[in-house]
Amino acid sequence: MEVPADSSSCLQVKRVHSLSVLKNKVSCFFLTIYWANALSRDSARVAGLDSEVRVRRDCELREGGMPSVLGTLDESMAEDAFGLGVDGYSEGASMFTADVTRLGRPLRRRAAGGDAGRAGEGAGAAGGLGRGGEARGGAAEAAETAEALDFQPPPSKLFAGRVERPISNDSIVTEAAETLSTHFDMSASTSSSSRGSSVVIEKSQAHEAAEESATGAPCKKYLFASSRDRLQLSLGGMEASLSSLHIPAAGADAGGAVHSVASFSRTAPALVTTSKALTPSQRYRLRREQNKVALQNSIKQREVFYEEQERGSRGRSASLKGVLGLPHAVDELSEDISDYLGWDVPVVSPTTGPFLAAAERSEKHTDRRPGVARSRSSTYVDHTMPPSPIPGIQKTSDLEFFTETSKKLSCVYLDTSKETSKSKLYERSQSAELLPIEFKAASDEGMEDLKLVSSGKMAVCSNSRPSWLPPKDTEERARHERQIRQTIDIASLSQIDRTKERAERDTRDEKNRKRLAQLVERGLVRKSTLTELKKICWETSLPPDSRFQIYTTLLQSDTAKLIEEQYIDNFDQVDALFRSMQFPNAKLAEIQAMLACTPCTANVAPADDLIYLLQLKAISRQGLLLGDPLLVHHLLQVGCYSTREIWVLVNILQLTCFNETTKDKYDRRIISSRGTVSTALSADKTFAQEFNSKCLNFTTWWHLMARLDHAVFMWCLDIIVAENSQPFKSNPIIRDKLNGKDWDYYRDLHVVVNYRIICALTLTVLLSYHFGFNNLYDLSFVDPAFQIIGPEQGDLGDVHATFIKKWHHNYKKF
């Protein structure tokens, strides 16, 4: 730009230019604040104004020099914004123009005074002070008039870092130029989106600006709208004048140049043709605008759905304009929907919701607008009904619309929660089985529910450590669990072995019983038969129904039965004697005291047969002997013998197996220092206090037998009888030789005195079952319920078999 020769005029131009720029900034600042408040306060009122009123007010404001923002601005608004009337504002109107866009679009400012000043400078540079000088003069006068106003400029520090370069009319195209088209036909509104920005059309000849500044009556046209539909409503019938509008170039050199308003599309920005080269800042802004437009186009190409909705909306809007005669209502509806779409809010209206079924109208609805025919099948839309988010046009409210969905979701969530809770409780119930016994006892007492025990507690709890001790560390826990598993494996193998042995024992018992029946039929008088019988007795107890026959055969021969005939009192005679006499009370008291000291009869009422047989035994020739209560009691427990048979068996057993000779030998040999018992007990010094005649005698042996249960007692009795048998075939009983002989003579010839078998039994108890008592003498004072081999130790079959095996092993030592 060429600087004028006159320095005073140059300084004046610079000052006017600076003041113009400053005033433009101050005015735009206050105008921005005003419209930020005015848009939020008066948006509903402005949107409801009639199109004719808006056009009339726009014309009035343009005549007064007040720019039209969003289509309307009255005098009161101007007074509120600047404290001036329309006339006062018109004085400074030539200094600036403002463009405020809708929905947060950037504010565009255009300094008309600066354009006029630059036009004047261009004219001066051309070599004259013609219309350009006049324009400078008009600008100076406008500046002086503006200085008279009460505007207080902001502090200079706000503008110290930013001095904008004046922008000429032919610089670059802004966003407002993109929405401008040379044809403002009504039918052209359906070709692009309604999201356009404000359009500013002005006459920019420099000489006309100078004339207008001198007269104070600007003739500029400011059209602010948010879409082409708003532009159509604002312009009204001015399409012809705008379509033929042309702007000549400023300056004398450019008198023949014609600048036509180019046709701008939404896809490519169009620039106003100019003969001047762009400055670097203009090229930079040009590239920035082009990039912005390209980005917008790229976004629009991806918004296929919304573009289709807009095209459908415009098509239906155009049809409704002709049918209903309500163009402004349809335009506003389409515009509002476009605003929703700009913010990606799905909305629906009766014209833009073809996918929604038409709501059934109530027959009682009588609110009909006069002059408009409505029908059930029509697409009439009440223009007062704003578009709303889906499903706003339904009869039901949003709450009712989503009630069913929310109920289903709630059911799903509740079911899922219940199933999850059940699975967690099931897992914890399963894991609770592995907790220590102390935890289970605490749970039973109500201290804590094991079903609520978490995995964290399970991690520190162990069956092998009490709960009051610190938890095990990882290594110790793993080591103990490994040892426990090994122990369990060994126990499992032992259990497998025991199960196998039980099965083998059952098979063996069945086989032995069959073999025993064959031996009884063959006769128990041979030595070979007795050997096999003894083996069977060590493995299997005798059948209860065969005991009487086997006992009498083994102890007195099956043919002679001399003991029963000569050395035992006849049962019938003793019974007759008992019935014919008064039994002494002292003797009865003695019998009851004996039964009270016997463990197997101490806690139960003695049977009548037991007392009866003991009374008979008391009045017999042998008298009541040690062991009679036990023998009578267990034989009665068998349940298959009569009182006569029990009488015979008890007397035979006392005369043969437990006679005086056996008793004497047992008492001497059990405590012999060179005997088998002494040799076995001497290895353990703890038996030194028991190895005496007080603890080891025939009486204490019966104390031992009283602590055995019925099954093992009878099995032991079977073995003792078998070991006291003899082969009567090789040593037969000759009745003639024994006639008139006493019992001692008969015992020496035909009775086997086997004390070793009962000594082996005592040794077995002392070595393997010495639990719960100090010695055999104190055993009689122990609780009557105590048993040496009791059911609490496991399966009786296994326990009894183990006891018999150990007894047999110790018997072999004798």
Swiss-Prot record:
InterPro entries the UniProt entry points to: Sbe2/Sbe22_C (IPR031403), SBE2/SBE22_M (IPR053949), SBE2/SBE22_N (IPR053948)
Pfam family, one: SBE2_C
Compositional bias of kind Gly residues: 114-136
GO cellular component, one term: Golgi apparatus
Keyword terms: Cell wall biogenesis/degradation, Golgi apparatus, Protein transport, Transport
Source domain of life: Eukaryota
Keyword Ligase: no
Membrane-spanning parts: none
Region entry Disordered, spans: 109-160, 360-395, 463-482
Biased composition (Low complexity): 137-149
Annotated compartments: Golgi apparatus
Segments of skewed composition (Basic and acidic residues): 360-370, 472-482
Biological processes annotated in GO: fungal-type cell wall organization; protein transport
Family (UniProt): Belongs to the SBE2 family.
Function in brief: With SBE22, is involved in cell wall integrity and polarity processes like bud growth.
Name of the molecule in the record: Protein SBE2
UniProt organism field: Eremothecium gossypii (strain ATCC 10895 / CBS 109.51 / FGSC 9923 / NRRL Y-1056) (Yeast)
